[in-house]
């Protein structure tokens, strides 16, 4: 179930302040955040935001097609190592 259309998209205030402060600087730095729940706004385009995945900060370069999605969608939290090999040949 998605967010109600009556409400505005959510973004953490501290993240929005960091992006606005970065807009005034001529040098673009990586913005670190723990806010996986924040929605990507059009003003984020062109910035690199390091999203925390539980172990480390994963750098995510924001592009135009990411607008409207959540930051956490682009920093997976689980590592998939694959299923165990098929042992039918070794059982014989």
UniProtKB/Swiss-Prot annotation:
Pfam families per record: Ribosomal_S19
Concerning InterPro entries, the annotation shows: Ribosomal_uS19, Ribosomal_uS19_bac-type, Ribosomal_uS19_CS, Ribosomal_uS19_SF
Q: Which GO terms describe its biological process?
A: ribosomal small subunit assembly; translation
A single GO cellular-component term from the record reads: cytoplasm
Which terms are listed as keywords in the entry? Ribonucleoprotein, Ribosomal protein, RNA-binding, rRNA-binding
Q: Does the keyword Acetylation apply?
A: no
Quick one: signal sequence residues? none
The superkingdom listed in its UniProt entry is Bacteria
**UniProt keyword GTP-binding present:** no
Q: Name one GO molecular function term.
A: structural constituent of ribosome
The family assignment reads: Belongs to the universal ribosomal protein uS19 family.
- Function recorded in the entry: Protein S19 forms a complex with S13 that binds strongly to the 16S ribosomal RNA.
**Descriptive protein name:** Small ribosomal subunit protein uS19
